[in-house]
Swiss-Prot record:
Keyword Repeat: yes
PROSITE patterns per record: MULTICOPPER_OXIDASE2
Domain Plastocyanin-like: 80-194, 205-358, 427-554
Disruption phenotype: Impairs the production of oosporein.
Residue positions with a glycan: 82, 98, 125, 291, 348, 365, 420, 439, 472, 493
Family note: Belongs to the multicopper oxidase family.
Signal peptide: 1-28
Protein name (Swiss-Prot/TrEMBL): Oxidoreductase OpS5
Entry's induction text: Expression is negatively regulated by the global transcription factor Msn2 that binds the stress-response element 5'-AGGGG-3'.
Length: 590
């Protein structure tokens, strides 16, 4: 068990921070979301001018405490395999689901049950699929993290995931096995529900992904040395882009790439669901000639605000509404690389096209001021991310501090990120859930980085992260099984004088920890399980930047089918992993 550094926060300090936040809230002007909240939503029909309605529920429903039970099951069958594709016109080996990148859309309504059968037809890789942002209330067995909630699915094996859509909005699913999702093993998710602003049409997900023509597995060696990994080759929007061939002798460069396109009709309002599924890319999203009204971050509806661009880090989502009020023409949709965060060979060429005339084939001749904005490796300003359903952070049962370092070890490990001097390194064959199920929890391996939450239900835990690594990189931290209550971020180390926002703080499941700074977050122990928290820069999670939150292990329960699946998958995995053809673990495993 990892030993955090525990601190006690004085009640007077908390009261001061709460009072300050409360005073700021009182001074706020009425918002569009407040107007929607004032409408009687009971049993009203969800439509273009009543998006806050949802039958017996509404945008005002506290989704942490109640959700519909539709009785509807949405069922999907996924086949994972090694194939050759050319998403941007450059042919290469990829990992794909149902032979597509991104994989199939998972679509459900708030309150539906979702069942996904995953078959692994890869040749030498295990896998497991994580449903990013899905709360998995009392359902830890289906979180899809190898070495934590299950053993990997071996080649030729299958696994069934089952979960309820208890929140609504936009997300994605991806492999949580090493670097697999950066090679294509990912796809979009939409959970339909109410919204904090009205719109006419839902255009679905806009998936922003960095892309490399050299396999990230081949680049992994370079990621472990001081110079870091080389620049990536390109980026994709919804699995498409153009790559400009420069070597006429390169037979892999087919030149068949194309841009993703959308059609706007003058006067309509469109919902677009932005998802950053990148390996280590920060994007600034913008559409030339149009503003964006932001209505949700991750799975949390927020009070709408209007901007001309949105910063989106790895693992994050923003739902935006775009009004088609520009002159009828063609416009660039942009995912602008923040190159001071991470290099890319074609940083300004991640483009889609908005067309008012669907018959047009002309390229846009437009620009955007965001091309000249300073790079931003952090998040949208916290003061803009105001949750519509107001929830305050309770007083902490315990507050613990974790300091981030960067240590050098002998190869093959090289550079590793550590929290309180320990890096995460799991054993695929001995997942935490298996040890809990078999009551073998007396001694967890130190590199499992197990953080035991306070005993008892509904205790508030405060976590302080300090970055003292002296590295020039922020970290998008993703928490499984919960939303962060983001109490504060800032430069330098956290001190007792650092301000905290306790009244309705921003909530989301992926938040950026500033470079050489601190992040303080809270969550309530209302969901038994082993929950991973990790950096969503894939290089960094592979280099050990993460830990496990072991929450109320005595209340972790399994159905007979879940227990059987856990043990059978581990038996099959161990049999495969002992064979000469096995894939050797070369990173943290997640």
């Amino acid at each position: 068990m990892m030993r955090p550094w525990t601190i006690l926060i004085a009640s007077s300090w908390l009261s001061l921070a709460a009072a300050s936040a409360s005073a700021s809230a009182c001074a706020a002007k009425p918002s569009v979301a407040a107007e929607i909240a004032s409408i009687d939503h009971d049993n009203c029909e969800h439509g273009p001018n009543s998006r806050g309605c949802w039958g017996d529920y509404s945008i005002n429903t506290n989704y942490y405490e109640q959700a519909p039970d539709t009785g509807v099951t949405r069922e999907y069958w996924f086949v994972v395999e090694n194939i050759t594709m050319a998403p941007d016109g450059y042919e290469q080996h990829v990992l794909a689901i149902n032979r597509s990148i991104p994989g199939p859309l998972i679509e459900a309504n708030w309150g539906d049950e979702v069942v996904i059968h995953v078959t692994n037809n890869m040749e030498r890789n295990g896998t497991a699929i994580h449903w990013h942002g899905i709360r998995q209330l009392n359902n830890n067995a289906h979180d899809g993290v190898p070495g934590v909630t299950q053993c990997p699915i071996p080649p030729g094996g299958s696994y069934t995931y089952r979960w309820k859509a208890e929140q609504y909005g936009t997300s994605w699913y991806h492999s949580h096995f090493s670097l697999q999702y950066s090679v294509g093993l990912q796809g979009p998710m939409i959970i339909h529900g109410p919204a904090t602003a009205n719109y006419d049409e839902d255009l679905g997900t806009v998936m922003l992904q960095d892309w490399s023509h050299v396999s990230p597995f081949a680049m992994w060696w370079y990621a472990r040395v001081p110079s870091g990994p080389p620049s990536l080759s390109n980026s994709l929007i919804n699995g498409k882009n153009i790559f400009r061939c420069t070597d006429p002798l390169d037979k892999n460069c087919l030149g068949t790439g194309e841009r993703s396109e959308w059609h706007f009709e003058k006067g309509k309002r469109y919902r677009m669901r932005l998802v950053n599924t990148g390996l280590y890319s920060n994007f600034r999203f913008a559409i030339d000639g149009h503003n964006l009204t932001v209505i949700a971050n991750d799975f949390v509806p927020i009070e709408p605000y209007t901007t001309d661009n949105v910063i989106i880090s790895m693992g994050q989502r923003y739902d935006v509404i775009v009004e088609a009020n520009a002159p009828e023409d063609n416009y660039w949709l942009r995912a602008i690389w923040q190159t001071s965060c991470c290099p890319n060979d074609y940083a300004n060429d991640t483009l889609g096209i908005i067309r008012y005339d669907p018959q047009s084939t002309a390229l846009p001749n437009t620009t955007h001021p965001a091309l000249h904005y300073p790079d931003n490796c952090d998040d949208e300003p916290a003061e803009k991310l105001v949750p519509h359903v107001k929830v305050d952070a309770g007083p902490p049962a315990r507050t613990d501090v974790f300091n981030l370092y960067r240590h050098t070890y002998d190869m093959p490990r090289g550079f590793m990120w550590t929290l309180n001097d320990t890096y995460l390194w799991i054993d695929w064959s001995k997942p935490t859930n298996l040890l809990v199920a078999e009551n073998d929890t007396t001694i967890f391996p130190p590199n499992y980085l197990l953080y035991h939450t306070p005993d008892g239900p509904n205790q508030w835990v405060y976590i302080v992260f300090n970055d003292i690594s002296e590295r020039n990189r922020s970290h998008p931290m993703h928490l499984h099984g919960h939303d962060f209550f983001l109490l504060g971020t800032g430069e330098g180390n956290f001190t007792k004088d650092s301000p905290l926002q306790l009244k309705n703080p921003p909530r989301r499941d992926t938040a950026s920890w500033p470079k050489r700074g601190y992040m303080v977050f809270a969550y309530k122990t209302d969901n038994p399980g082993a929950w991973l928290i990790h950096c969503h820069i894939a290089w960094h999670s592979s280099q050990g930047l993460g830990m496990q939150m072991l929450e109320r292990p005595g209340e972790m329960t399994y159905t007979e089918d879940e227990d059987q699946a856990l043990h059978q998958t581990c038996q099959s995995w161990n049999k495969f992993y002992e064979s000469p053809e096995q894939y050797i673990q070369e990173d943290s495993g997640i």
